[in-house]
């Protein structure tokens, strides 16, 4: 078993970061995620948003893994459960693979919280527990997978920034459109008054 952990601070408020987290896929930084299906989403009586999603991924595999499973690329599935608490301003996301569970399990947990000293920033804490089963090189493979998870975490943070930029652009477009739709009738009214 190999445990990997990481912490990252986003220079964006919690509301923006959690919105981006729910819209992270697909993105150009991690093209291996080829699909996201929402299986269930509901708000509980205390106001927490619960989501259960299925992520479809397609990976090119290292040569040692190819020889073990007999495939060069494989589609895998990950189940993801998240809980967003808007009162406490926390988002916890847990994911686990549901493909190849007889060979490997990857259990990941991400937590998003406002930065304790700066509410305009958000702290992301990540943890992954990797277990390779029934292979003599399991510790080597677990280390290799931890390295891949670390690399993908960096891509994930880049993807979050990409989504946040996209969301900010959409907000600005909506604001500009709203300003324009207000100005047009006002300009027409002013023209009528001048006549």
UniProtKB/Swiss-Prot annotation:
Pfam families: PRELI (PF04707). One of its GO terms (cellular component) is mitochondrial intermembrane space. Residues 1-172 form the PRELI/MSF1 domain. The keyword Phosphoprotein applies. Keywords: Phosphoprotein. It comes from the Eukaryota. Belongs to the slowmo family. PANTHER family: MSF1/PX19 RELATED (PTHR11158). This is PRELI domain containing protein 3B. It comes from Cricetulus griseus. The lineage of its organism: Eukaryota, Metazoa, Chordata, Craniata, Vertebrata. The gene is PRELID3B.
């Amino acid at each position: 078993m190999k445990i990997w952990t990481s912490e990252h601070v986003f220079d964006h408020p919690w509301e923006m970061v959690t919105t981006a987290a729910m819209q992270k896929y697909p993105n150009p930084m991690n093209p291996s995620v080829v699909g996201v299906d929402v299986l269930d989403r509901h708000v509980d009586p205390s106001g927490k948003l619960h989501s259960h999603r299925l992520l479809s991924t397609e990976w090119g595999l290292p040569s040692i893994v190819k020889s073990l499973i007999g495939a060069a690329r494989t589609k895998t599935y990950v189940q993801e459960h998240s809980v967003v608490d808007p009162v406490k301003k926390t988002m916890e996301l847990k994911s686990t693979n549901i493909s190849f569970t007889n060979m490997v399990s990857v259990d990941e947990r991400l937590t998003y919280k406002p930065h304790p000293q700066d509410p305009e920033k958000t702290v992301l804490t990540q943890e992954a527990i990797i277990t390779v089963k029934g292979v003599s090189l399991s510790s080597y493979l677990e280390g290799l997978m931890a390295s891949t998870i670390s690399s993908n975490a960096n891509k994930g943070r880049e993807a979050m920034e990409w989504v946040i930029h996209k969301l900010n652009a959409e907000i600005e477009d909506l604001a500009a459109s709203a300003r324009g739709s207000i100005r047009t009738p006002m300009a027409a009214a002013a023209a009528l008054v001048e006549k």
